[in-house]
Regions:
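Short hydrophobic/aromatic beta-strand micro-patches
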Residues: 56, 113-117, 178-180, 235-239
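Hydrophobic, helix-prone linear segments
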Residues: 22, 38-92, 96-108
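Short, conserved charged micro-motifs
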Residues: 61-65, 119-125, 184-186, 241-247
Length: 285
């Protein structure tokens, strides 16, 4: 799979990659820098962190319960009025679910890759997801591909990857957030979060926190048309002693724009990345 239009990504987001693929016998990426190296290279960018991946949901509680069951994460009340999931391991960000009356229109620009340790483990993950309300979907994947493509109760696409995928090795169960996006937007998020690029070839990019956790990847052209506000977006925030305005100014300088989606007077700043994807810059925390 990889792309949700059925055309596989060349490398980064190809859900059908096999361990025997010559491209992926070894992870084809820049080596993850050490802490000292990371500070030398990205130290001036360490002014915000990825706080949450936010879902617009018609039924936030139901969707949160689904993902809590699939991922094994703890469900808690969110201080902003939604529902949040706290990860069972230190991936660095949470999931948050907020009410929305908007219906899903077309594929999301982001989807999830969940890994498997064995074929039995893959089957168990699929069965668990189906039992919680997922459904099989056909996005043009080929019969010989080993991954399983599903959608959550509100249509959010995700793939359960077969065992032996070298690209996702050591990334954990929730291994990748695979996005439709340009090379420019991959470079933007590398600078925005201070996460190094672990792939940057053929207009495909991927980043990963120096602490580990899932990769975030962008598959390059052609880009999906944007149909209204994205149902998934990032919340980022400066650290406790940071400066929200300074962070917003920095993000504008590397390609973001401030946008108005009718948010009114709120404490956060709504912005869009170079591909037009909305995200929010919260107050320091």
């Amino acid at each position: 799979m990889g792309r949700l239009d059925g055309r596989p990504f060349q490398r980064v987001n190809d859900c059908g990659l096999r361990a025997s693929s010559p491209t992926f016998d070894k992870e084809p990426c820049m080596p993850k820098p050490s802490g000292a190296c990371f500070l030398r290279r990205y130290g001036d960018l360490m002014t915000c962190h990825l706080l949450a991946l936010c879902f617009d949901a018609n039924d936030p509680l139901r969707l949160a319960r689904f993902w809590a069951g699939v991922l094994g994460w703890e469900m808690v009340d969110d201080p902003e009025g939604g529902v949040a999931l706290l990860p069972s391991n230190d991936i660095g960000f949470r999931f948050e679910f907020f009410p929305s009356q908007e219906q899903k229109a077309g594929p999301n620009r982001m989807h999830f890759h969940l890994t498997s340790t064995s074929l039995e483990d893959q089957q168990q993950t699929v069965a668990r997801a189906l039992g919680l309300g997922a459904r099989h979907i056909d996005i043009g994947q080929r019969p010989e591909e080993g991954h399983v493509v599903l959608a959550d109760p509100e249509g959010t696409e995700f793939c359960v990857i077969e065992p032996g995928n070298n690209w996702l090795a050591d990334c954990g169960f929730f291994a990748e957030l695979a996005c439709n996006g340009s090379q420019k937007v991959g470079h933007f998020w590398s600078e925005a979060l201070g996460w190094p690029l672990v792939w940057d070839q053929d207009q495909e990019t991927a980043i990963r926190s120096p602490r580990g956790g899932p990769k975030i990847s962008w598959g390059g052209p052609p880009l999906m048309p944007k149909t209204g506000k994205n149902r998934l977006h990032f919340d980022i925030a400066p650290p406790v002693h940071g400066d929200q305005k300074a962070e917003v100014d920095r993000l504008v300088s590397v390609g973001a724009t401030r946008i108005d989606i009718g948010q009114g007077e709120v404490s956060w700043v709504v912005m869009a990345d170079p591909d037009g994807n909305e995200f929010c810059v919260l107050t320091p925390r």
